Every structure is written in C-alpha cells, then in structure tokens.
C-alpha cells in the first residue's frame, strides 16, 4: 500500500518559486500583498515608462487629464507654451490629492485645503500668508525666511510623447522610450501612432476583481481567444487557423500578437468540440462586421500590443483603442479603454469604428468574457496560494512564433518578472 501524500500548507509562510523557468507560476504571485507592493516599486515607479494618455485628450493650453501610474494619482496637462507635463496629484504642503476632476481646463492648480497654488508645469507660485499677517503693529506667522518656493513644487515626472501617445516615469534615469520598447515593438507602436492626428471617440471603464498581471497575460495569450470567445471563433476574427505571428522585445516584457482574419465558418481542425463555435449564429446588424482594410495596417487585420506593465494598444479590424491597466491592490484593477479614430476620418469611418467598438469593453461581445475568467481565476488563486498554473502550451521555450497555439508570450513575461522581482 502506498504512503498517503503529505498535505502541503495552503498558505505557506516562506513560499518558493516552483523550480527553474517560467512555465509554472505559483498562485501566490497573484495573492501576496507584500509582493504587490514590490511590483509597484519596481515595475510602476522605477525603471519603466507607463502610459498616461493621448495628446488628443489635452489639445488646448490648460487642458488636463487626471489618471494614475500604479496607485499614484498623476495629472497630464498642456502648459501655455504647448508642452505636455505630468505631475503628481499630491500637494507639496500637506499631501492632499487636490485635483478631483477627471478632465478639465485650468489656468493653474491649487489645493483647496490651504490654497497653495501651482503653475501648469508644477512649480509652486503662491502660498497664502507666506509673509505673515500684520496685526497691532507686528507680523504674526508666516513661513520661515529660508522657505523657497522653488523647493516645494509638485513632483514632476519624465515625459515621452510619440505619435500622439504620452508615457511618463517617476524615474528620471529611465532609459529612452524608444530603447524601452525596442525596435520590434516600436515598429508596431508606430504602426498605430504614425503621426496622424487622433480623434477621441469615447471611454469605457470597469473594475475587475483580479490581479493586474492577469490582463497582461490575457492579451499575451493567443491560446484562448478561439476557445473562449464566440465572436472570434464563429466569425474568424481571431482563432487558431488565422495567419499569425507572435513577437517580443529582447527582454520578453513587451509583445505583439499579429493576426490576419480568416473566413470563419466550420474548420473541423479548430472548431470541433469547441463550445464557443456557434455555426448558426448570424449578426442582426451587419455593420458590426463591416470591415474595410486600411492602408496603414500593412496586411494584418489585428495587432494587440502589450507594453509592460501598464497598457495594451488594440487594433482589432477598424476599432482602435488603448487599454490602461490601473492596479488597485493585489486582487483588483481598473481597466480604462480610450477609443479613438483619426482626425481625417469622415463620419462614415467614425461610425464604423464606434460600431465595431461594441465587441469590446465591459459589456462587449468579446471582452465581457475576459473580465469574468479573470475574476474566477483570482478566486481560485485565493483559495489555495500554494498551487501553481501550467503555462506549457508550445513547450517550455521562449521565443517568437508564426502560430498561435502557444503560451510563449506569458512565459516570456514571467521570465522578465522573475528577474526584476528577484523571485
């Protein structure tokens, strides 16, 4: 009679990564709050560029957008000289988050608590009662004589604007943005942000109860779309028999999933036994799939580009958007979609992009599935942190491929994550 297996603790005190490589990811990588804080420090607040917005969101002097990097609130603002600045939304006096509006226009910033006033470049320019108050022949209060305005401005971030997209970093020693992306991913970035003026079409926002890395994984995972998503498998938008490529940067942190739409329909090789394939499904509004090739595509009908750690750039047929990942604790993140077109689009093109955008977002015909499976995955991780995922489709290796039946991009991401996090 064989010996009964010894039970492993469900909540290990000093957990260790299960072996070499990145094809087995422990559940505790998604559940440990101490690890999450380290991720914020090493991935969002140092050594990385993070997405903050699009120039088209702040076209005029004084226009601003409040957003976040990691959990730190920041403001992207266009100054009177036309420059783009990103400053932290924390008053230098008593630490209040002074900006409450998501979008607006301002001549300057001030904190309502004590009325400290800042320029749009983040410089402190006014302190009430700085020189005290005269009363009965004497001066009461006031700031010390050695108090200097220039030493008490808002925290200023380093800014990189390219092709209409804006990234920022708290780390002023971060590598140049182009080097951060690397030539392969920069090519796909420039494919979307190619210098044409952008036009904002709208926003979607959702809170997903799952670890933020799961959304990066989801868009680095070509294995699931043709299995999970009815729309993708039935109409050939994204499935295993599409012509495709997967590409990464040299450090494996960023990736591009590149696909050319197939004809859909019943290919037994890829739809046999697949529940998401609905042979009889038809669209009531054919405009949803009224796809017109655009010259800038250069062939592929879809490219999903993940820029680690903060954003996904989506081109899925004629729908174009950024998807901003905003962590909110180890088990939750906000996911903000900015849908856009181009300034030279006519009304017909704008409507086409808006209609196709219904595939995406929290109630989208495709993306609603992703939000649910991320939530349910997090529930499983919290239940038994000592267990691990299996990321072995396509083997254990990490590298570019010319097919989608693989999890190589996820293995690449965790190879990089382990090096940075020291796990």
UniProtKB/Swiss-Prot annotation:
Q: Which amino acid positions bind [2Fe-2S] cluster, per UniProt?
A: 91, 93, 111, 114
Its UniProt pathway annotation is: Aromatic compound metabolism; naphthalene degradation
When the coding gene is removed by deletion, what phenotypic consequences does the entry describe? Cells lacking this gene are not able to convert salicylate to gentisate.
- Region feature Disordered, mapped onto this chain: 1-20
Domain of life, per lineage: Bacteria
- Which EC number(s) does the record attach to this protein? 1.14.13.172
Q: Which residues bind Fe cation?
A: 224, 229, 370
- Record-annotated Rieske domain positions: 49-168
Does the keyword Iron feature in the UniProt annotation? Answer: yes
Q: What is this protein called?
A: Salicylate 5-hydroxylase, large oxygenase component
Organism equals Ralstonia sp
């Amino acid at each position: 009679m064989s010996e009964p297996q010894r039970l492993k603790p469900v909540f290990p005190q000093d957990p260790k990564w299960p072996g070499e490589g990145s094809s087995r990811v422990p559940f505790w990588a998604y559940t440990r709050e101490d690890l999450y804080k380290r991720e914020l420090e090493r991935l969002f607040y140092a050594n990385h560029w993070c997405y903050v917005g699009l120039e088209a969101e702040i076209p005029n002097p004084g226009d601003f957008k409040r957003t976040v990097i990691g959990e730190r609130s920041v403001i992207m603002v266009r100054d009177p000289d036309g420059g783009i600045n990103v400053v932290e939304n924390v008053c230098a006096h008593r630490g209040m988050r002074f900006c409450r509006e998501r979008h607006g226009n301002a001549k300057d910033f001030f904190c309502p608590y004590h009325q400290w006033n800042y320029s749009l470049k983040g410089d402190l320019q006014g302190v009430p009662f700085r020189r005290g108050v005269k009363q009965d022949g004497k001066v009461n209060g006031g700031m010390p004589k050695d108090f200097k305005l220039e030493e008490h401005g808002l925290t200023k971030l380093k800014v990189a604007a390219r092709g209409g997209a804006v990234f920022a970093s708290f780390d002023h020693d971060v590598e140049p943005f182009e080097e951060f992306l690397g030539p392969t991913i920069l090519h796909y970035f420039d494919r979307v942000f190619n210098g044409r003026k952008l036009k904002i079409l709208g926003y979607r926002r959702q809170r997903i109860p799952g670890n933020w890395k799961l959304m990066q994984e989801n868009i680095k995972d070509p294995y699931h779309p043709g299995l999970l998503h009815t729309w993708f498998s039935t109409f050939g938008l994204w499935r295993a028999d599409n012509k495709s490529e997967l590409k990464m940067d040299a450090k494996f942190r960023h990736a591009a999933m590149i696909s050319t739409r197939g004809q859909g329909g019943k290919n037994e090789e890829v739809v046999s036994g697949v529940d998401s394939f609905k042979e009889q499904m038809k669209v009531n509004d054919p405009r949803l799939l009224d796809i017109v090739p655009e010259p800038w595509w250069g062939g592929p009908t879809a490219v999903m580009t993940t820029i680690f750690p903060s954003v996904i750039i989506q081109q899925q047929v004629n729908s174009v958007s950024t998807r901003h990942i905003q962590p909110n604790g180890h088990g939750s993140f906000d996911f903000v979609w900015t849908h856009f077109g181009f300034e030279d689009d006519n009304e017909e093109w704008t409507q086409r992009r808006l209609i196709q955008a219904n595939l995406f977002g929290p109630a989208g015909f495709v993306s609603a599935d992703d939000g649910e499976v991320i939530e349910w995955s997090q529930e499983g991780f919290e239940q038994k942190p000592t267990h691990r995922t299996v990321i072995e489709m396509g083997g254990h290796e990490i590298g570019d491929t010319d097919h989608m039946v693989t999890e190589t991009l996820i293995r690449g991401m965790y190879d990089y994550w382990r090096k940075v996090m020291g796990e």
